């Protein structure tokens, strides 16, 4: 570069014996450089001149002396920091203001440290332990009770009930039948294996049956219609000499008048009203 070329690219003033700044292979006097190229400080809104330290974070700029925590005002130069809603905070202020608190010890969970989340609450990893054995649960399966969280082995040892059918632990829900506990998915009809969880059912010798299977296997049959007589819905029936009828089927075999609550005659296992049965050789 010759002496003739040693001038400010912007104002053309000679730079001989003066401070200057080289930018993109061009020379600028300090005054022109600061006026044209300086960034403006986010804090004080003044230009960051060439003789000042320019600190940059996410395309925002600060003087070195302005780069401070917005809460405690301590310098953040060469120190770790975090941003919250575009505010710069030192790690201590960020932790106090923004970090989660441990559900167990109530202390701050520091940024960058591992935390456990369960049912909307947070724990230090070392605080998230089984209520019984005090061992860290981590990401292992757990069962929660009002008294705390338990690892599966401790829960089974201390609290578990066992299914009467599969003999495995019932961890939630379940059905009680004949003083025994069952998984919902194990409570099935002893005949057809139909799920009885949301169904009406009947029992025989402490075994559950759906209504259809019970009626087919055990229910008495109506002499008149041959259909099962089930007491599940409170249906009324008539019993006479080891024979049963639905109330609506207990009618005269000749004129079909209802015989419920009335006198009747029988002949060859048929029933008749007294009028129709008169003159017949009845069984009674």
From Swiss-Prot:
A zinc finger (C4-type) spans 8-32. It comes from Macaca fascicularis (Crab-eating macaque). May be involved in the regulation of spermatogenesis. Stimulates CREM transcriptional activity in a phosphorylation-independent manner. One of its GO terms (cellular component) is Z disc. One of its GO terms (biological process) is positive regulation of transcription by RNA polymerase II. Interacts with CREM (via the third LIM domain). Interacts (via second LIM domain) with SPAG8. It holds the Pfam family LIM_FHL2-3_N. GO terms for molecular function: transcription coactivator activity; zinc ion binding. This is Four and a half LIM domains protein 5. Keywords: LIM domain, Metal-binding, Nucleus, Repeat, Zinc, Zinc-finger. The keyword ATP-binding does not apply. Signal peptide: none annotated. Transmembrane segments: none annotated. It comes from the Eukaryota. Residues 39-100, 101-160, 161-220, 223-283 form the LIM zinc-binding domain. The keyword Metal-binding applies. InterPro entries: FHL5_LIM2 (IPR042947), LIM_FHL1/2/3/5_N (IPR056807), Znf_LIM (IPR001781). Disulfide bonds: none annotated. It is found in: Nucleus.
């Amino acid at each position: 570069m010759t002496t003739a070329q040693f001038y400010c690219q912007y104002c053309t003033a000679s730079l001989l014996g003066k401070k200057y700044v080289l930018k993109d292979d061009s020379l600028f006097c300090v005054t022109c450089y600061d006026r044209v190229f300086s960034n403006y400080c986010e804090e004080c809104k003044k230009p960051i001149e060439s003789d000042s330290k320019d600190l940059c974070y996410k395309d925002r700029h600060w003087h070195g002396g302005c780069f401070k925590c917005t809460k405690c005002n301590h310098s953040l130069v060469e120190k770790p920091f975090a941003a919250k809603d575009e505010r710069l905070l030192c790690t201590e202020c960020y932790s106090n203001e923004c970090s989660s608190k441990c559900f167990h010890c109530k202390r701050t969970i520091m940024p960058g440290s591992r935390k456990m989340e369960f049912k909307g609450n947070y724990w230090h990893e070392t605080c998230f332990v089984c209520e019984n054995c005090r061992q860290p649960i981590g990401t292992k399966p757990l069962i929660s009770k009002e008294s705390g969280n338990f690892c599966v082995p401790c829960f089974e040892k201390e609290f578990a009930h066992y299914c009467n059918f599969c003999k495995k632990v019932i961890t939630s829900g379940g059905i009680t039948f004949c003083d025994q506990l069952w998984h919902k998915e194990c409570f099935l009809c002893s005949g057809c294996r139909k799920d009885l969880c949301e169904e009406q059912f009947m029992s025989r010798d402490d075994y559950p049956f759906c209504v259809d299977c019970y009626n087919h296997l055990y229910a008495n049959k109506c002499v008149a219609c041959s259909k099962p007589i089930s007491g599940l819905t409170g249906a009324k029936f008539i019993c006479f000499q080891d024979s049963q009828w639905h109330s609506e089927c207990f009618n005269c075999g000749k004129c079909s008048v209802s015989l419920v609550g009335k006198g009747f005659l029988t002949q060859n296992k048929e029933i008749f009203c007294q009028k129709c049965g008169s003159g017949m050789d009845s069984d009674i």
